[in-house]
From Swiss-Prot:
<dbReference type="GO" id="GO:0009142">
    <property type="term" value="P:nucleoside triphosphate biosynthetic process"/>
</dbReference>
<feature type="binding site">
    <location>
        <position position="213"/>
    </location>
    <ligand>
        <name>Mg(2+)</name>
    </ligand>
</feature>
<feature type="binding site">
    <location>
        <position position="199"/>
    </location>
    <ligand>
        <name>Mg(2+)</name>
    </ligand>
</feature>
<dbReference type="GO" id="GO:0006099">
    <property type="term" value="P:tricarboxylic acid cycle"/>
</dbReference>
<dbReference type="GO" id="GO:0004776">
    <property type="term" value="F:succinate-CoA ligase (GDP-forming) activity"/>
</dbReference>
<feature type="binding site">
    <location>
        <begin position="321"/>
        <end position="323"/>
    </location>
    <ligand>
        <name>substrate</name>
    </ligand>
</feature>
<dbReference type="Pfam" id="PF08442">
    <property type="entry name" value="ATP-grasp_2"/>
</dbReference>
<keyword id="KW-0547">Nucleotide-binding</keyword>
<dbReference type="InterPro" id="IPR005811">
    <property type="entry name" value="SUCC_ACL_C"/>
</dbReference>
<feature type="binding site">
    <location>
        <position position="107"/>
    </location>
    <ligand>
        <name>ATP</name>
    </ligand>
</feature>
<dbReference type="InterPro" id="IPR017866">
    <property type="entry name" value="Succ-CoA_synthase_bsu_CS"/>
</dbReference>
<feature type="binding site">
    <location>
        <position position="46"/>
    </location>
    <ligand>
        <name>ATP</name>
    </ligand>
</feature>
<comment type="function">
    <text>Succinyl-CoA synthetase functions in the citric acid cycle (TCA), coupling the hydrolysis of succinyl-CoA to the synthesis of either ATP or GTP and thus represents the only step of substrate-level phosphorylation in the TCA. The beta subunit provides nucleotide specificity of the enzyme and binds the substrate succinate, while the binding sites for coenzyme A and phosphate are found in the alpha subunit. Can also generate UTP or CTP, although it preferentially synthesizes ATP and/or GTP.</text>
</comment>
<keyword id="KW-0816">Tricarboxylic acid cycle</keyword>
<dbReference type="GO" id="GO:0004550">
    <property type="term" value="F:nucleoside diphosphate kinase activity"/>
</dbReference>
<protein>
    <recommendedName>
        <fullName>Succinate--CoA ligase [ADP-forming] subunit beta</fullName>
        <ecNumber>6.2.1.5</ecNumber>
    </recommendedName>
</protein>
<dbReference type="GO" id="GO:0042709">
    <property type="term" value="C:succinate-CoA ligase complex"/>
</dbReference>
Amino acid sequence: MNLHEYQGKQLFAEYGLPVSKGFAVDTPEEAAEACDKIGGSEWVVKAQVHAGGRGKAGGVKLVKSKEDAKAFAQQWLGKNLVTYQTDANGQPVSKILVESCTDIDKELYLGAVVDRSSRRIVFMASTEGGVDIEKVAHDTPEKILKATIDPLVGAQPYQGRELAFQLGLKGDQIKQFTHIFVGLAKLFQDYDLALLEVNPLVIKKDGNLHCLDAKINIDSNALYRQPKLRAMHDPSQDDAREAHAQKWELNYVALEGNIGCMVNGAGLAMGTMDIVNLHGGKPANFLDVGGGATKERVTEAFKIILSDSNVKAVLVNIFGGIVRCDMIAEGIIGAVKEVGVKVPVVVRLEGNNAELGAKVLAESGLNIIAATSLTDAAQQVVKAAEGK
């Protein structure tokens, strides 16, 4: 689950980290009022969406009057912002962050992720702030500095000082950076985060450090014990199909192809997508119905897949282990009848009661194509999607 920038900065402030004075507003009038509350003669207004690249898309602007702030809010509230990280429809803007202007001398990067290979939180810092850190890591990996956090003792001040020295910070800046580093590490652990970024972490003209942005991603598996963060969830930023899938405990990720995939097991689902791609097809989604594939869940899975107008054929690939193939077959038949599936459906069943499942499908009288192997299934569904 992602947080908006203004929500991330609220958490930063709770941990005593330096952030700009600002207000998240819902109306143009509130945007003008926020300028009065903040004071000064210049403000930064930012459209709040769960995507990067807002500046290039016109979603961030420096304004010099309350009227300009109001006009910016009128321009974006209720509209969709399209950036290089969104799809063609963009993300809806329901809040605008109005904050004080910061005099920037230099931009740095500071972030943290859970590194699965070392099973530790790893902090990364760089002198290349304000740009895409993935590009920096690819083009100039030597500019990425790292500090690994021991889970038994947490982030230590000496690690912060070490990074500060390597970033070329001096004097009181080292103390400030260490404070930010330790605070972010505590925030990361306290709230079960999966990713945290301050990009850019800036050195102001007066020499002080300042967190100019906040990107936070929470481990969704830990949300049950993070009620405060759960309450910050903005459903308007979710893909409608993915939100529907979540209600039914289906793992769904929308893609850009035309072949819908319904599979039990994440590994098998990825393998299915690979083999579809190998035979010239393009998967429209990743969908794992899991081990408890009931008729109801299969029906909902079909509804989700077919809500994508790009889908021209559906491949159902089930390995019967925990779940019986004959039960899945009955679920598929019931779902096809209930949903009124108009596109070709290719089914490959293997494992527990696979032969019985194939028999049930054959006797259903429905236009369901039975595949004899995974390769056959991929070839059949690609042909079906092409209308052959």
